[in-house]
């Protein structure tokens, strides 16, 4: 009887789990955001070499690292851009983590959008500070080249940690899904 009871309990648990997964898949609760490969990064209009796995690309004030297909752009007291030009300081196409180096302040400014991104998720995190100053536009904006977004081409800005300051005439973040994930 004991073995029969244990077998019955195990079968019921498996049935409940299977039913739960079935219901979750019907309501799209089991799918995560598709990763969008990083295809382009520009800093102050200059195209950045996207490094191979385990490699880095480095300039004064920033480092772009590829860690098993996850790209991390670390800002280290980067002072870039100008309020006299509408060119974005950072342009991104694909998933990118913007890492704020501990105890540093990076200041980016533009007459137009400071950070312009296409599809993919821009994650901002770290223990530093990022100041975005725009004279006439939003600090972070999207440009999807006239394309519609779908499940294969998601777009979001994810704010995890760090100090983020927006100054200027425009809004902070425009035309984006914003995810807040505090530590």
Language-model features and meaning:
Residues 5, 17, 21-183:
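A composition-driven surface/loop motif
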Residues 10-18:
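Alpha-helical transmembrane segments
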Residues 1-10:
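N-terminal Sec-pathway targeting helices
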């Amino acid at each position: 009887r004991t073995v029969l009871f244990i077998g019955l309990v195990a079968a019921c648990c498996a049935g409940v789990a299977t039913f739960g997964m079935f219901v979750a898949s019907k309501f799209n609760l089991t799918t995560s955001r598709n990763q969008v490969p990083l295809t382009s990064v520009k800093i102050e209009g200059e195209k950045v070499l996207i490094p191979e796995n385990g490699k880095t690309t480095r300039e004064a004030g920033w480092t772009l690292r590829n860690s098993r297909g996850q790209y991390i752009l670390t800002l280290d007291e980067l002072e870039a851009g100008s309020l006299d030009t509408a060119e974005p300081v950072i342009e991104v196409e694909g998933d990118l983590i913007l890492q704020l180096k501990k105890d540093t302040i990076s200041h980016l400014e533009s007459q137009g959008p400071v950070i312009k991104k296409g599809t993919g998720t821009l994650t901002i995190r770290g223990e530093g500070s990022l100041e975005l100053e725009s004279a006439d536009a939003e600090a972070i904006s999207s440009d999807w080249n006239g394309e519609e977004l779908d499940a294969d081409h998601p777009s979001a800005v994810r704010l995890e940690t760090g100090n983020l300051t927006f100054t200027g005439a425009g809004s902070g973040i425009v035309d984006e899904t914003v995810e807040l994930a505090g530590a």
